[in-house]
Amino acid sequence: MAIKRPKGTQDHLPDGSPKLSLDTRAAAFTFVRETARRVLERAGAQFTDTPLFEEAELVQRGVGGSTDIVRKEMFTVYYFGDHGGFILRPEGTAGLVRSYLQNGLKQLPAPLKLWTHGPMFRAENVQKGRLRQFHQVDYEVLGSADALVDAEAIALMTEVVRALGVQKVKVKLGSIGDPEDREAYNTYLRELFTPHLEALSDDSKDRLNRNPMRILDSKSESDQTLIAQLGVRPMLDFLGEGARTHFEQVQAYLNAWDVSYEVDPSIVRGLDYYRRTAWELHHEGVGAKSALGGGGRYDGLAQELGSKEVVPGIGWAFGIERLLLAMDAEGVALPETSGPLLYVAAMDDENVTYAATVALTTRRTARAEFAYRAMKPAAAFRDAERRGARFIALIGSDEVAQDTLSIKNLQTGQQSKVQTRDLQAFLAGQADQHSPAIPHDPTPQEKA
């Protein structure tokens, strides 16, 4: 029996693969990451990264023991004599805050803007837009409790998504108040739901004591029916003066910047460390629950992880796979990836090394590939065209003796005879017509 990839995972495939789709196209993931990098780094965010596995206690304390993530969805790591003290990270925020505290990043100018991307792991039921290994872009700001920081974070999230060509998104904005506001709301919910305990799902019965607010985002249809029947008051009704003023300020900034949003009293974040601002970004084309991602403020997280000081923080994340589904639903076409600018082939065995040297030299300034064995011209042309090359250089004994290259433009059919020493200048004149479709960081040679 052939070994297959685990359920709930995907291979990211090169262009031209027979089973290619937008959400399995490796170039699509590169495009999303590079677009996010450009937008976020222009806003002052710095890239960081954390391990794929962390201490289980980090997630238990940082995410919250009452969440589905901790109770049902963690992948535990076992090795040698270990007894399961590590987990594959289910989200990025707790690890980034742990890194901030452990590495003394509070010494850097505040607020500190960080961003990252990478795989996350949750043992979820697999469905459209829900995978067990999925990929996120994550943005965090540490060191400021200002409402202006919240508004900027929301604006940046929408800017990244729109830069990717996705327009039909909706920001659903809410607030879950301060700890005392949440406690008052939880007391209200316990009193409301306790007489109807038998009508709750088993999960929600457990949540009633641990974290009643989590009942409101239950996936159980019977729970949602009961919530509607009881006419549950929204969290916004319980905001104290500080949280309410903060929420109004966030909206004022968004209005000033023409960032479209709707206030949604039902927004309840599933993670226990959130305070005040919370939001979700929705798109109808992504399947389950339609959320591309979300974010919120988590001023209590650093102390939960052992900090002696309050470290205000806010952040967001979106799933790359879900975003690609939204792009597909809107018919967004990725820029075409380009093949090599130059393909070099030797026509006889003794000149293969020479051809390879020409290609390697060309790579100082442009993308080039070469044939690993001697080829007849017809076969070389076919191979170059399959690879999407723009130019082909055929090298035989005459070319080597004369130190020249016979170059043909595969798009126009134009042929040129170029001195080998002039190849870089010849190709430089073509570079602006053959720039890569996927944005990239310049090489040291390109910087020079």
Swiss-Prot record:
InterPro entries per record = aa-tRNA-synth_II, aa-tRNA-synth_II/BPL/LPL, Anticodon-bd, Anticodon-bd_dom_sf, His-tRNA-ligase, HisRS-like_core, HisRS/HisZ
Q: Which GO terms describe its molecular function?
A: ATP binding; histidine-tRNA ligase activity
For this protein, what is the EC number? 6.1.1.21
**Region (Disordered), start-end ranges:** 1-20, 428-448
Q: Which GO terms describe its cellular component?
A: cytoplasm
Keyword annotations for this protein, in alphabetical order, are:
Aminoacyl-tRNA synthetase, ATP-binding, Cytoplasm, Ligase, Nucleotide-binding, Protein biosynthesis
Name the Gene Ontology biological process terms: histidyl-tRNA aminoacylation
User: Which catalytic reaction applies to this protein?
Assistant: tRNA(His) + L-histidine + ATP = L-histidyl-tRNA(His) + AMP + diphosphate + H(+)
Provide the transmembrane region boundaries. Answer: none
Family under the similarity heading: Belongs to the class-II aminoacyl-tRNA synthetase family.
How does it associate, per the subunit comment?
Homodimer.
Protein name in the entry: Histidine--tRNA ligase
Gene assigned in the entry:
hisS
